[in-house]
Amino acid sequence: MFDISKRLEVTPLTWGSLGQGILTGKYDKNVTFEANDRRSRDIYVNFHGEKLIKNLKIVEELKKISNEIDKSVSAVAIRWILDYLSDSVVIAGVKNINQLNGNREALGWNLSEEHIKILEMISKE
């Protein structure tokens, strides 16, 4: 995506940057949703089967990094996008002030090269 956006001279705009909440660290392998929640449908693969397991591995790395640098998991996820896709715009929804504050922690700093490499590697597995 980075190469394409650079070649076309467009700014990447990431919608659903926290994966409908999966990258906030609040869900585990036993997650279930009400029938009226769109994430309960199989079309939302991030919350089902092998894709869920893969995403939870990414979340575990996000949690390790967030503990190491004293930032929220969502802040690390957002910062990863901003650092990996330079000049990108992140859209992340919130339901309450705590989520907003957690997301705001992504501002004013950068992930280390080591953290970016770890997250890039695990996301490509």
Segments the model singles out, each with a brief description of its role:
Residues F2-K63:
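Glycine-rich, positively charged active-site loop/lid region within alpha/beta enzyme cores that binds
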Residues S17-L18, H48-G108:
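Conserved short secondary-structure transition element at the edge of the structured enzyme core
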Residues K26-D28, E34-A35, Y44-V45, S88, ...:
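Charge-rich, low-complexity amphipathic helices
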Residues N110-E125:
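Extended hydrophobic/aromatic segments used for targeting, binding, or gating
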